[in-house]
Amino acid sequence: MSQPRPLLSPPETEEQLLAQAQQLSGYTLGELAALAGLVTPENLKRDKGWIGVLLEIWLGASAGSKPEQDFAALGVELKTIPVDSLGRPLETTFVCVAPLTGNSGVTWETSHVRHKLKRVLWIPVEGERSIPLAQRRVGSPLLWTPNEEEDRQLREDWEELMDMIVLGQVERITARHGEYLQIRPKAANAKALTEAIGARGERILTLPRGFYLKKNFTSALLARHFLIQ
């Protein structure tokens, strides 16, 4: 069997994207890095986004850190998800930065969260720390669109969390708010502050926040599609 090659330009169809992702299934991260001419870091402590970058190179992703989807022409977002030996997610999944100001008139339908999650290519990757990074294998891809129930679950959490932001309660939001979607600080250091609305409607400075999918949401999603027991 011939070795796969990274896509040199963005895929033109979902079928091409999925076919390329399926070719990567079963390869280790070290093998894919070597085939792409990259060096595999010893661990992810200083290279937290390395796996995502590696797979973006292989799949011809275009967006980088821009607000549009990774495959903007297809409207598809790429999400790598570290899983244990039973295929269960090991951590929450970052969706996008949470807007803390300028939220008047924003609805779920027009929200950045929904835009990012309306079509997702999930790629599970072995994530147990006992497995050296280079030896972790890539799993089978899943091209997913939220069904009605999933959309409702996410919408209810998003509305609850956005209400708290708009009402000046951002500092009261904890990771326990939201059943499937949570907001928590997203900053490499505590000095990176951003503007938000305070309890009396005044401008305050606070840590940037991000939206994350909780493990119970992604676990059910993967289990349903891969029939994990």
Curated annotation (Swiss-Prot):
Keyword DNA repair among UniProt keywords: yes
Alphabetical UniProt keywords: Cytoplasm, DNA damage, DNA repair, Endonuclease, Hydrolase, Nuclease
Chain ranges passing through the membrane: none
Family annotation (Pfam families): MutH
Compartments it resides in: Cytoplasm
Annotated signal sequence range: none
One GO MF term: endonuclease activity
Coiled coil stretches, renumbered: none
GO CC entries: cytoplasm
Gene Ontology BP term (one): DNA modification
HAMAP family given in the database record: MutH (MF_00759)
Family indicated by similarity: Belongs to the MutH family.
Biological role: Sequence-specific endonuclease that cleaves unmethylated GATC sequences. It is involved in DNA mismatch repair.
Protein name as annotated: DNA mismatch repair protein MutH
Source organism per UniProt: Shigella boydii serotype 18 (strain CDC 3083-94 / BS512)
